[in-house]
Structures are given as structure tokens and as C-alpha cells.
Amino acid sequence: MRLTPNYDYEVSSIDKKKRGYIVQIIGPVLDVAFSPGMMPSIYNALVVQGRHKQEPNVTCEVQQLLGNNRVRAVAMSDTDGLMRGMEVIDTGTPISVPVGGSTLGRIFNVLGEPVDQLGPVETNQLSPIHRSAPPFLKLDTRLSIFETGIKVVDLLAPYRRGGKVGLFGGAGVGKTVLIMELINNIAKAYGGVSVFGGVGERTREGNDLYMEMKESGVINQQKLAESKVALVYGQMNEPPGARMRVGLTALTMAEYFRDVNRQDVLLFIDNIFRFVQAGSEVSALLGRMPSAVGYQPTLSTEMGSLQERITSTKEGSITSIQAVYVPADDLTDPAPATTFAHLDATTVLSRSLAAKGIYPAVDPLDSTSMMLQPQIVGEQHYKTAQRVKQTLQRYKELQDIIAILGLDELSDDDRLTVARARKIERFLSQPFFVAEIFTGSPGKYVSLAETIRGCTLILSGEFDDLPEQAFYLVGTIDEVNAKAMLEEEKNFTK
């Protein structure tokens, strides 16, 4: 049952609800019998009440109506201790989670329950996690750039406002720091907020992210209301039902900020592959015939129902950045292939750039965006981006020759290309606000116009006489001159 938004939703009293009992338990799947005429709807939340006050209630979601007044439901938490005959209550609505400003700075599970030991969430506003995508008339179809203040992203692989971005990065290449910087920048530039959905991620990674966000100020421990992000986690150790629905919980919280607060929202999903994987587990448990490579036959439908809700409306936007795991590096695998159909841009983090100390380690040649078209970004932006890519591509082609024969064996034109490419490579690095406490360098937010101006000047040869180190970890091109002069003064005084 898909509901339209109702943010004044109230839970009816227990006495008025339909009651049934468990007739079968197979792992995280329960079969529940109800009286004739009292059957719950698909996606309704069922609650199995613990026998003692010490035992937690188990919430399940109706997935199938089996006939003979029975339903099949998937549990959102462990089913240890449950037994046949236990009473089950139909809540009458889908799983509903808290929404609004009180969710900022907090960590939630799939049911919207806080798990950070900071007490209950002070809000009466609840919203069901199953909702329809915004109607056509409410959509904002304009193609507009979502400026992030990160030079390499805005210039070479710009994000679309209300679009979806695939973030490809292994361990230790700066994925977490890039995520935190995007959260910080959207809060400052747009007055927006972010929601992070940890879908099937490691508990340690989720804890590390929370601690780093507190250290960098993205989460304000003293004044939680001033935090810029809400966190929703469904870890690897949780049942497949929780991992399958935690993405919808995060999205529901993001939709409130878009529809009611009229804000630009950044939604992170890590990892979208685990959303598909959990759906595959649930599908097998429900007895559905598997499709290609063992995935669920409803893969495209499940992915579409999530992705179509991530969009721009006339009130605000949800821009989504999704980490994508590619099984065995096979891009034709149904899980990543289905995801790619929804992506507007890809941001690829490079281990070789990270090894050089160039952060953010975004690969300028592998990262792509459908927004990088002259009719969308303008002629100047498009031509500058293409010239930058051509210069970096030529440098990449020459690297083998340089490694074998050295720079001296190159032609004058190629040597000039290499020098400018190395300067551009370093200019596309920049200090981050969230890394200030580690690096000691103040963070920089660089506008797109300044990035284009800087790259144009480097390519035109205006800075051929400056050392390439002057371009490393600066903001605008004006800082390059200042840094070069400072280095010159230091060398002179020595």
C-alpha cells in the first residue's frame, strides 16, 4: 500500500488493531494467520509482542497474501525467541519513521528508532516509508548544475540538481572525506541538509563515519539541531529485511526536507549493491523463482521504486550520491547494470592519484557526466573541460615514454603539454573544510567560474614560469601567484 505524504500521521491505539498469530517461522520469514475479513494489506507493518517486558517487539512487513487468511511477512530484526502461536498485531500502516529537523545529528535504524543512546527523538511527525514518486506536474525538469565547490567535480563531471551520482572508490582513497566535504558544502552554499543511508555496511565503518563527522563538526554534539546530517544504518549483521528497507527509511527522511522544508537535500546511499543483494535474499526466502545470475525477478521494479523518488520538484531537490560495488569487476552483472540505467554522473576515485597525495583523488578521465554538454553547461565550460581532458589524456599517453627515456627525449610541444598537465593535475586538488583539523590548511570552496578561469589561464600559458608545487592544494588561481611569491621569498631568505 503506497501512501501519499502525511506528516501529521498518528498511530491509532493498540485496541483498535487487527490481531493474528504466528503459524510458521523460517528464519526471518513469518507466516501469520488472521481472522476472516481482518487481513492486513501488502507492506503493512506487523508487530510481534514480546512475552515479557524485557523482550523487544519484532516488527515485520507484509510481503505476500497466501490465501486461507494467511500472510507472509519479513522481519526487520532477529527472530530469535519467537515461536508459533505468538500474538501478532497489524498496525494498519506501513513502517513509519520520524522526520524533520529533530532527526539531524542522530543515528536511526530501519524502523526510525534512535540507536545512538541519546534518548528519544522529540517529534510527533511520522511518515510511511512506502510512498509514490512525485507526480509529473510537480517535477522540476530544468537541467541545472548542482555546484559542489569541489573543482574537479564541477568542471569535469558536474552533478545534476536532483540527479543521481555513482561513487566508485576502494578503501583508503578518500571516499569518506569526499562524502563529508559534500555534506559540509551543501549546508553552507544552499542551506541544505544531508541524509546518509548505510545499507548493509560494516558496523565499524558506520562507527568511524559517525566519529569523523563529530570531529569535523558536521555533527554538532553540543547543539544537535545545528548538525547537517541524519544517519540511518542497516548493518551487515542485520536481517535481509532491514537491509532491504533501510534505503527507503533514509529516503523518506530526505523527502520531508525537500517537500516540507523546501530544501536542497543530499542523499548518500552506501552501498546500493547491498540493497539489491538484500532484495535477492528476501526474494529467495519468499519462494520466488530467481532470474538472471540468481537475482530476484523484481530487480528492475525494486530499483525503480527507490530511484524514481530521488528527484527535483518545484519545492526542492534530492541529489543522490550512491556508492556502487561492481561484483568481480563485471559491469554487465544485473545489479550494477540496473543501477547504471539511473545514474546521471559517475565519480571515480583513483588510487594512483591518492598515492601522489592529490586529494580529492577524483580521476578526471574516468569520471563522466551527462550534464557536460555545451547546451547545458555553456560553451566556455564545455570547451575548457574538453581541453583539460585532452591535455591530461596526452600526458597519460606520454607517461610510458617518460618512464623509459625521460623528459628530455620529448618534443618541445610535448614537454609543454606535460608541464601544463602536471599543473592542472595539482590545481584540481584542493584543501577540504572537514580535513582542516588534520592538515592545518583552511578549507576552500571554489566557484565554478573561478575553476574555469583558473584552468583557462593555465592552458593558455599564463603560468608556465611558475613551479608546479605552487598549484598544489590551493583554492582559486589567484592563490597560486601568492603561494609562488611566498615560496620565492622563503628561498631568497635562505
From Swiss-Prot:
Gene Ontology cellular-component annotations: chloroplast thylakoid membrane; mitochondrion; proton-transporting ATP synthase complex
Binding site for ATP: G169, G170, A171, G172, V173, G174, K175, T176
Bilayer disposition of the protein: Peripheral membrane protein
Superkingdom, taxonomy of origin: Eukaryota
Known EC number: 7.1.2.2
Pfam families according to UniProt: ATP-synt_ab, ATP-synt_ab_N, ATP-synt_VA_C
Swiss-Prot/TrEMBL keywords: ATP synthesis, ATP-binding, CF(1), Hydrogen ion transport, Ion transport, Membrane, Nucleotide-binding, Plastid, Translocase, Transport
Predominant location: plastid
GO BP of this protein: proton motive force-driven mitochondrial ATP synthesis
Signal sequence range: none
Location in or out of the cell: Plastid membrane
Reactions catalysed: ATP + H2O + 4 H(+)(in) = ADP + phosphate + 5 H(+)(out)
GO terms of molecular function: ATP binding; ATP hydrolysis activity; proton-transporting ATP synthase activity, rotational mechanism
NCBIfam families per UniProt: atpD
Function: Produces ATP from ADP in the presence of a proton gradient across the membrane. The catalytic sites are hosted primarily by the beta subunits.
Subunit organization: F-type ATPases have 2 components, CF(1) - the catalytic core - and CF(0) - the membrane proton channel. CF(1) has five subunits: alpha(3), beta(3), gamma(1), delta(1), epsilon(1). CF(0) has four main subunits: a(1), b(1), b'(1) and c(9-12).
Family: Belongs to the ATPase alpha/beta chains family.
PANTHER family: ATP SYNTHASE, ATP SYNTHASE SUBUNIT BETA, MITOCHONDRIAL
Annotated protein name in UniProt: ATP synthase subunit beta, plastid
